[in-house]
Amino acid sequence: VASAQFSTPQRSVRVLDAPGHRDFVPNAIVGASQADAALLVIDGAVGGFEKGFSAAPGGALGQGGGQTREHVQLARCLGITQLAVCITKLDTLGDAGYPGTEAVQERFEAIRQQLEPFLKKAGFRPGAVQWLPASGYTGENLVSRSAASELAWFQGPTVTEAVDTFEAGDRRVELPFRMPVAEVLPKGRELGPAAVAGRVEAGAAMSGTNVRVAPSGRIVKIKKLQACGEPLTLARAGDAAEAGLLGLEEGEVRQGDILCHPNFPVPVVRRLEARVATLDIMVPLLKGREVVVHAHAAAAAGQVAEIRARLDPKTGQVQKERPRCVTRNQAAVLVLDLERPLCLEKYADFRGLGRITIRDGGHTVAVGTVTELLEFE
């Protein structure tokens, strides 16, 4: 996931650019799991939005259609509640035979009318969604607008103004230290041979602090902390940080590991219970189905070991105990067995480490939260 840093009058902002192509949805999951808010970039060119928002015949999301729907659902289910929808490439309408300000405004409103009901269904409150046009080619409405442009009709915020209104998420500094490894950095002079980057989910750490690396259990020392290459004295919950680790060699830490407090280690599990919601899937979830379970920056192959209950999606009440299968747009309680251990927490204890995404064959089939940790490594 590409990363960049910039500042607005109110915020210091870290941008995580998640790829839109369906082959890179796991990368998008890693990015969204670290985010407080999302900027959904929509291709407003003729046919662009329709291609991204379409679904394959039969309604299977992400199976031959675009990725807009899947990315929206993943973002919401990974804890993002704040969203700005940025419609771009409206300046290309003239080249496609639709010149003028009126055509640009009509296209903007048409996209909004189609997308808004889906965002609401996905769980985004209308009041938490901002709508704005912008041009990456001309820079129009990124930080300012020109009265002579085709976007002069728009009276809403610029992209930077929209970002300024986002609120920082809940910073759980009072909990034991937790930092998932989102990226293993190349060997360097400043951070040494074992260097990692990620977002601190809970607690805080300083240079010289001892931490445990899970799942290996190795106790190491933080040699140095940085943020975007600049020295960092203290990394607290919510901060993006790079850490050099003393006591490890290159290759001894990997993406998906977690740095944690030595006396309060993160659970390492092979079996878990999760409350999930299926997406618009074509093939029902059955006991024994092989899947891939994604959590924060980690992923592991696994299997649906049990379907304990099917739930009412609105109330959460049990509709049926031990059903044979779970079909599209249903809620259920599953037990998942993992082929290799993952570092997980119950959602009730650490939200950022208790969300999971279930995928199969390159498609997201369900999303949910960890309710119980059943078998430890």
Residue ranges and their predicted role:
Residues 9, 31, 35, 41-45, ...:
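Conserved, well-folded catalytic cores of nucleic-acid-processing
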Residues 1, 10, 19-24, 30-34, ...:
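Charged, alpha-helix-enriched surfaces in structured cytosolic catalytic cores
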Residues 17, 28, 39, 75, ...:
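Residue-level signature of catalytic and energy-coupling elements of molecular machines
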Residues 1-14, 55-57, 136, 176-179:
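P-loop NTPase nucleotide-binding/switch module
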Residues 10-14, 18-24, 33-109:
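Conserved Switch II/interswitch segment of TRAFAC-class P-loop GTPases
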Residues 81, 92-176, 180-185:
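Canonical P-loop GTPase G-domain recognition
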Residues 8-11, 187-377:
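C-terminal effector/interaction modules appended to NTPase cores
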Residues 29, 52-54, 98-99, 145-146, ...:
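Short coil/turn segments at secondary-structure boundaries
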